[in-house]
Amino acid sequence: MSYNILRHRDHPGGLTDPGLLATIREDLARDGWTLLRGFQPDMEAFSGVVTTLCRRVTFDPARSHTTDTTQMVDAGLGPIGLHIENGNTPRCPDIVTFFAQTAAFEGSQTTICDGRAVWDRFDDALKVRWSQRMTVERVLPEALWKRYLANEHPAISDPAQVTMEHVLQFKAAIPDQDFALHPDGSLTYRLTLDPVRPSALGGETRGFANAVLGPSHNYQPPRYAMADGTEVTPEEIERIRALAEEVTHEINWQDGDIAILDNTRVMHGRRAIADANRNLFIGMGTI
């Protein structure tokens, strides 16, 4: 994986420089990620990057908003395993962007890992197993699933507007998902997906890009089951985690950095936070 840094001195027009967007897309197509450094953006400028790259913006319903298109990242202080953002939702973002408004003095490096490199490290048995489809199942509290649906359904914008008709419409619009509603308003959600996939940005090369190795911050831990009926075990996850660590790299943040990732190819995580004086924001969506 190349360590791509696009610097302001090479793009004097700043974040709206005509050549910058083309270079970002070249880096994403080649390496799956890039880093913008020295542009000194504010939150409005970061939001502009998100809307330029993403035709449609999406959110994590458990996070607080900072603008109409961005949210604050707040996931405790411990390390976070590799994952794609919103990887267990029916509309997985194609692009995820991070803005280090204030970088930590120590620790808190964002880890990045090309799913194609992980897939290349799988032996034949692992490749056969993970070429199957996988079902994710978890229980979502009423507040979270209604916030998600209010953002994703085109006819509503407020969780208070959600009705069962909207739920059924969303289910019909996106295949491979099912649910069971409970008396307390919570919902058992099931999504069947491909844990190994080609990038949404183009090309046929597949990569291990999913949320199996990742956290469940703000959510109930999911249950993962393969198409053959077997569950994904903790031992299996740790084996893959070790393989992925061999090809994992770190972003050592500087104030004002913006990282842009192909969320259908490159997984990300975080080292433990040693300096809590940091502010990181996220924006994501579909191309």
Regions found by a protein language model. Name each.
Residues 1-13, 66, 76-82, 91-287:
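Active-site environment of non-heme Fe oxygenases that use a 2-His-1-carboxylate facial triad
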Residues 1-88:
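N-terminal non-catalytic cap/leader segment that marks the start of a structured domain
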